[in-house]
């Protein structure tokens, strides 16, 4: 059975919850059309620990597709990231209390990698399912961008560059939105069930496209 590796992140910063973690946990073990199975895992919000965990997952699971997810509090809808860039630069401490400035992720590696997910097919599937979504041209320079770049680099370096791989940012859920202090601007949010549904539809679109490509090579 081919595997889609699905990751989410633990809660971080001031957020009491991470909707990407909930979606990943809810979809673990899901059987998708075409005989695909979902293997979910949670990543720590610390770049080096997340990179080590992701390397282990990629090596052990040997996935046929990779869908990384994380929270982008403030975005009103689900968004697919087009590119991962090879630098860390953030002032919000990670969960190890660290910040980084202009720090290369992989010295002497490409400055950026384009995601290899079927972005337009996912957008079309969302639209058919009445889920608003879009493509983003910046995953930021925090841990979300780190794991996107790390996964794409690892796959390329290990001869797996054709494996569909990319990142999906989800908006806040109600728990995250309700944790915002009353004197701060409110966050847009979606019910957790809708966030999970968007991740599931994306996974189905990825594996459907991959199955078609595999059949074309037979």
Swiss-Prot record:
Pfam families: Peptidase_C15 (PF01470)
Catalytic activity: Release of an N-terminal pyroglutamyl group from a polypeptide, the second amino acid generally not being Pro
GO-annotated cellular components: cytosol
Gene: pcp
Name this protein carries in UniProt: Pyrrolidone-carboxylate peptidase
Quaternary structure (record): Homotetramer.
EC numbers for this chain: 3.4.19.3
Physiological role: Removes 5-oxoproline from various penultimate amino acid residues except L-proline.
Organism: Deinococcus radiodurans (strain ATCC 13939 / DSM 20539 / JCM 16871 / CCUG 27074 / LMG 4051 / NBRC 15346 / NCIMB 9279 / VKM B-1422 / R1)
GO MF assignments: pyroglutamyl-peptidase activity
Phylogenetic classification of the source organism: Bacteria, Thermotogati, Deinococcota, Deinococci, Deinococcales
Enzyme type, top EC level: hydrolase
UniProt keyword annotations, A-Z: Cytoplasm, Hydrolase, Protease, Thiol protease
GO biological process, one term: proteolysis
Family, similarity comment: Belongs to the peptidase C15 family.
Main location class: cytoplasm
Domain of life assignment: Bacteria
